[in-house]
Amino acid sequence: FESNGFEGASVRAICSQANANIAAINYYFGSKETLYGEVVKHVFLASDGSETMPRLAHNPMEPIAQLCAWVEWHVTRYLPRQNSTVATFIRRELANPSPLLQEIVDVTILQSLEALKEIVAAILPQSTSEDELNHHCLQINGPTMVAAILQPINTRMPGFESGNMPIKALVRQAQIWSLARLKAGGAEISERWFALD
């Protein structure tokens, strides 16, 4: 499924490569769609890290620290040095959505955005509208997702490759951008949060 997508993969070829019995696959999964669903769940949940995902409830008195922790979790989850299986599945689903796209969104992306939204809501002024709050969250989430999804293109642009920039530096850059965005949106954020490590 990773190399050929839902439409391009055949159960027969998968069974041949996995040295598995087609009858057993049909018995346990019943259909190609169900098998694909289980594979996708495994890929996303194995890399999900939802148990370690920072949430406001973990440190409600320090929402800015929780935002920085969430950004670190998010960047390290989606920006590995080599192409990630999760990003490959996301690219395939965007290009040719399977019947499971909504479930993928619900199980992975939506849960992390909801956790981010709680944190961001605790940082921004109470007068911030729901639309503004959502926009801030999408702008914090988006650059990392885009970089992960476009990784095959980014590696082919001379002079714009991510190179050997340490993941810690990428995380800190994303944290500063996120904090600056919220400060521009009216959040009171001390300059100490913008200091480079």
Regions found by a protein language model. Give the residues of each.
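Conserved phosphoryl-transfer catalytic core
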Residues: 43-51, 55
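Hydrophobic alpha-helical connector segments
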Residues: 52-84, 133-140
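Hydrophobic/aromatic residues within well-ordered alpha-helical segments
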Residues: 32, 39, 43, 67, ...
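Generic alpha-helical structural context detector
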Residues: 37, 41, 45, 72, ...
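Helix-turn-helix
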Residues: 3-34, 38, 42
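Hydrophobic/aromatic-rich alpha-helical bundle segments in the mid-to-C-terminal region
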Residues: 87-89, 102-110, 119-175, 186-197
